[in-house]
Design a protein with these regions (language model features):
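Solvent-exposed loop/turn and edge beta-strand elements of beta-rich ligand-binding domains
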Residues: 1-210
């Protein structure tokens, strides 16, 4: 009898959801990589001719898929007790984010989140590799590092990146100037109102003296 080596395979397709609030869906690019520096990252772009769902709050949503990843038995770590590879397993780590363009769309605030994806691939001893993925947010949408906690562990299978459109958003780097201007304007208005009240009070006082 000819010996046939034991083999098994499994697949997993990483997905993301792109959401826009307050505006229309544009061509946004998302990146997927097996390293935190996103070297040689795979990319997907929102499809303006594809299915775009309108959410309950009026936003626009589209789910995108990266290329399918295939796992083979020789990629996994065999059990010391089974040289055939049955029951072998391995953990893989990936990262996903939205690409921040050098020329962003006007009045859109981009989501700067980064998610770390942990994929567990386990041979089920019946020629199939079972693949499960868990997601953890490691950078929030404002670009800040997320501290270690459980609030950013996701139970769903599609990390969501939300961009916000607003004509009232200050231009990048101008928020401080805008706030200073508004504060100064408020002070001037208050001073003008106080002077107007003083003039009316003085005028009434003059009339009484006559």
């Amino acid at each position: 009898n000819k010996y046939t080596p034991y083999t098994s395979t499994g697949t997993w397709t990483p997905k993301v959801t792109k959401v826009v609030k307050g505006g229309e869906m544009k061509e946004f690019k998302l990146e997927f990589a097996d390293n935190a520096d996103f070297k040689n990252a795979k990319t997907v772009v929102t499809n303006l001719k594809g299915e775009i769902i309108t959410t309950a709050d009026g936003g626009k949503s589209q789910t995108l898929s990266f290329d399918k990843i295939e796992y083979k038995l020789d990629q996994l770590n065999k059990l010391p007790t089974d040289s055939t590879g049955r029951g072998a397993s391995k953990t893989f780590t990936y990262y996903v984010r939205e690409q921040q363009p050098t020329t962003p769309f006007t009045n859109y605030k981009y989501d700067q989140s980064i998610y770390q994806i942990t994929v567990n691939a386990v041979d089920n001893t019946d020629h199939k590799i079972n693949v499960t993925a868990t997601y953890k947010q490691i950078q929030d949408r404002d670009g800040n590092e997320v501290t270690t906690d459980t609030d950013h562990n996701l139970t769903d299978s599609t990390p969501t990146f939300t961009n916000t459109y607003s004509t009232s958003l200050p231009l990048s780097g101008m928020s401080g100037v805008t706030l200073t201007y508004l504060a100064g304007a408020a002070v001037l208005c208050a001073a003008a109102a106080w002077m107007h009240i003083r003039r009316k009070a003085n005028a009434k006082g003059g009339e009484r003296r006559e």
